[in-house]
C-alpha cells in the first residue's frame, strides 16, 4: 500500500525470516519500482540438521526454492544473509552443506560469525558448545572467503550500469 500511495519514496525490507517471504511479497516487490530489489534472508546454516537444532522454521530445500523464486521474479535482486560457523555439534559435512548453499545462492554480501553462547538462549541452556574455537575460526574464514568471491562476482555484474540506490544513515 505504501509503495502504491507514495511512489517517490524508496522502500526497503530490513530483514525477513525465510518462511515469511511469500510469493505474494515477491510479486509486490516486482510490481513497484520504488521497492528496493534487495532482501536480507538470515539462513544461519546450509545444513538441515543444524537448522533443526537452531529451531529454524525452514529447511535447506525450502530456502533454495525461495531463492529460485526470487531469481525468477526479481532477477537482479540483491540477497544477503547471516551465517554462523561452528554451531554446537556442527560436523565437517554440515559445514560443507553451508558452503554448498552459498555456492548455490551466490549472495551479494553477508554477516558471518563464529558461534558463541548467548546467555538466556535455548542453545546456551540445552546444547553443549562442543566445536573447538580453532575449528570455528577455520570454518568462519572459509565462509568469509567464499562470500568475498561471490560478492566480487555479483558486483562485477553491475559494472557500467546506472542503478537507483537507497542511501541510509
Regions inferred by a protein language model and the residue ranges of each:
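Conserved SAM/AdoMet-binding glycine-rich loop
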Residues: 1-92
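Terminal RNA-binding accessory module
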Residues: 125-169
Amino acid at each position: 500500500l505504501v509503495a502504491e500511495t507514495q511512489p517517490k519514496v524508496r522502500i526497503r525490507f530490513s530483514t525477513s525470516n525465510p518462511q515469511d517471504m511469500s510469493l505474494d511479497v515477491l510479486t509486490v516487490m516486482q510490481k513497484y519500482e520504488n521497492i528496493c530489489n534487495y532482501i536480507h534472508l538470515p539462513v544461519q546454516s546450509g545444513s538441515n540438521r543444524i537448522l533443526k537444532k537452531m529451531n529454524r522454521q525452514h529447511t535447506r530445500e525450502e530456502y533454495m526454492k525461495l531463492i529460485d523464486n526470487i531469481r525468477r521474479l526479481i532477477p537482479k535482486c540483491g540477497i544477503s544473509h547471516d551465517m554462523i560457523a561452528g554451531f554446537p555439534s556442527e560436523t565437517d559435512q554440515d559445514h560443507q552443506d553451508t558452503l554448498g548453499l552459498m555456492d548455490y545462492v551466490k549472495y551479494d554480501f553477508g554477516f558471518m560469525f563464529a558461534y558463541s553462547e548467548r546467555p538466556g538462549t535455548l542453545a546456551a541452556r540445552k546444547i553443549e558448545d562442543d566445536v573447538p574455537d580453532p575449528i570455528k575460526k577455520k570454518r568462519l574464514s572459509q565462509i568469509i572467503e567464499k562470500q568475498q568471491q561471490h560478492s566480487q562476482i555479483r558486483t562485477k555484474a553491475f559494472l557500467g550500469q546506472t542503478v537507483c540506490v537507497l542511501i541510509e544513515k
